[in-house]
Amino acid sequence: GRDAYIAQPENCVYECAQNSYCNDLCTKNGATSGYCQWLGKYGNACWCKDLPDNVPIRIPGKCHF
């Protein structure tokens, strides 16, 4: 797995306010844990620890809604 911003299908991050929301999102996707990274590169976004390789992560480039 890898530590990364978990991405939606459009390469957009999951915006957040609470660590609990991200921890739930990340662990549901197979990560060991997650938290809300405040004021990061993509604003307030969920960061996952040890996310499985088959789960999309935010990569450079635009987020397409």
Curated annotation (Swiss-Prot):
Pfam family, one: Toxin_3
Gene3D superfamilies (alphabetical): Knottin, scorpion toxin-like
Keywords: Amidation, Disulfide bond, Ion channel impairing toxin, Neurotoxin, Secreted, Toxin, Voltage-gated sodium channel impairing toxin
Gene Ontology annotations for the cellular component aspect, listed alphabetically: extracellular region
Record protein name field: Alpha-toxin Bot1
Chain ranges of the LCN-type CS-alpha/beta domain: 2-64
Organism name: Buthus occitanus tunetanus
Tissue: Expressed by the venom gland.
